[in-house]
Amino acid sequence: MVMLDLLSNALIQIKNAEIMGKKQVVIWPVNKLIYHTLRVLQRYGYVGEIEYIDDGRGGKYVVQLLGKINDIGPIRPRYPVKYREIVQWEQKFLPARQIGILVISTSQGVMSHIEAKERKIGGVLLAYVY
């Protein structure tokens, strides 16, 4: 089976493990975009420790779950968003103000919509979590 969108696959694996009440999830296959997205989730307290395991076939991430994710998912298609439009996308994907984050890929790296608003930069929407 060919997986076309590794980020979507990883986020759905996390969502399914949270629903089942698991304490950790193994994400495979992986890439740098998945790692940077997981780091954003870790910075905001949605996931715990992230451990990389090199198995000789591309590697795996073992992610500790904290049980704080109500919903997580990819944003497809990956919409380009300007700095001034971030609030509109917040209203579309997040349940309320100050609840959850949007993950945005910018020219300065992968970050949350909160950081992007502080730095006044836009980017491409990758995922939402709350």
UniProtKB/Swiss-Prot annotation:
Q: Name one GO biological process term.
A: translation
Q: Into which family does the record put it?
A: Belongs to the universal ribosomal protein uS8 family.
Quick check: keyword Ribonucleoprotein in the entry? yes
- One term under GO cellular component: ribonucleoprotein complex
Subunit: Part of the 30S ribosomal subunit.
- Summary of the function given for this chain in its UniProt record: One of the primary rRNA binding proteins, it binds directly to 16S rRNA central domain where it helps coordinate assembly of the platform of the 30S subunit.
Question: Which GO MF terms does the UniProt record name?
Answer: rRNA binding; structural constituent of ribosome
Organism lineage reads as: Archaea, Thermoproteota, Thermoprotei, Thermoproteales, Thermoproteaceae
Q: Give UniProt keywords alphabetically.
A: Ribonucleoprotein, Ribosomal protein, RNA-binding, rRNA-binding
User: What's the superkingdom here?
Assistant: Archaea
Q: Which HAMAP family match?
A: Ribosomal_uS8_A (MF_01302_A)
Q: What is this protein called?
A: Small ribosomal subunit protein uS8
Question: Does Amino-acid biosynthesis appear among the keywords?
Answer: no
